[in-house]
Amino acid sequence: MNNVLIITGPTASGKSKISIKIAQDNNGVIINCDSKQIYKEIPIITDQPKLNETFIPHKLYGYVSAVKQYSVAEWVNDLKREIYQTFTENKLPIITGGSGMYISSIIYGLSQIPAIEENIRYQTKQLFNTLGNKEFYSLLIEKDPIAKRLHYNNSYQLLRAYEVIEQTGTSIFRLQEELKRKPLFDNFTLCILVPQRQEVYKKINDRFISMINSSVIEEVKNLISLNIPNHFPAMKAHGIPEIIQYLTNKISIEKAIEIAQRNTRHYAKRQYTWFKNQFPNALFYESQDQLLKFISKKFK
């Protein structure tokens, strides 16, 4: 029976490194499920693997233009193609990354909520731009009290929840419960890497300094030159908003580093809680050695 291995966890938890080791030992192919590492214009700021440094096949990295609003459904289609190709080669597909929506779509399947009409999508976006996050959030929970579970800074999910209740009159959360969903694959193993938080926070801080010392500033300058709207997903990758503020003389580089590091640490903190709440039956590992021991037994 074909197996699919999923390695996820908070940002900077070491997912990429351990996935390479597992792939080397198990004739594997690494397939990306990070929603920002898909964009080809921002390999440094999104910490995409340096493919010239490994002989392991990597798929779905840096293959979408940042000028495109790429959906979860599109990614699922691309993922299926790569998975089935891996099966035909008798290799182990190793899906790795930390994007919650991508992981959820694998484990629980895609939502069957009807497509949103273009005029509702446009009106919702205009309203969001006018009100800003907090006021828009307040308006949303008036219409859909269940949406209180969302964070007011998660603009993508706020917009999605508002669009759905505007079009259907029903909460997106209610629809997700009512509409039948099933996993993308029949046989998968979900492993979540959760190192000690202080270890992850230090890696986050060090990684951003390393990016600044490389050519990440030029990378963001090139991104700005494409005149991409600020609400496009690529523009929200961790560190990009802060570097843009620096490049537009709104804050110093020191302040940009401080804010970017703090925001990314806060994101990692939320990820720890989210993974445990969303996937209580997953296999959780604090150390890479623990995970490697399990994999060696599972796939020997």
Curated annotation (Swiss-Prot):
NCBIfam families: miaA
InterPro entries in the cross-refs: Dimethylallyltransferase, IPT, P-loop_NTPase
Sequence positions that bind substrate: T11, A12, S13, G14, K15, S16
UniProt keyword Protease, yes or no: no
Catalytic activity: adenosine(37) in tRNA + dimethylallyl diphosphate = N(6)-dimethylallyladenosine(37) in tRNA + diphosphate
Known EC number: 2.5.1.75
Cofactor: Mg(2+)
Binding site for ATP: G9, P10, T11, A12, S13, G14, K15, S16
Protein task: Catalyzes the transfer of a dimethylallyl group onto the adenine at position 37 in tRNAs that read codons beginning with uridine, leading to the formation of N6-(dimethylallyl)adenosine (i(6)A).
Subunit and interaction comment: Monomer.
Record GO terms (molecular function): ATP binding; tRNA dimethylallyltransferase activity
Family: Belongs to the IPP transferase family.
Gene this chain is encoded by: miaA
Alphabetic keyword roster: ATP-binding, Magnesium, Nucleotide-binding, Transferase, tRNA processing
Site (Interaction with substrate tRNA): S99, R121
Domain of life (superkingdom): Bacteria
Any one Gene Ontology BP term: tRNA modification
Name recorded for this polypeptide: tRNA dimethylallyltransferase
Record region (Interaction with substrate tRNA): 34-37
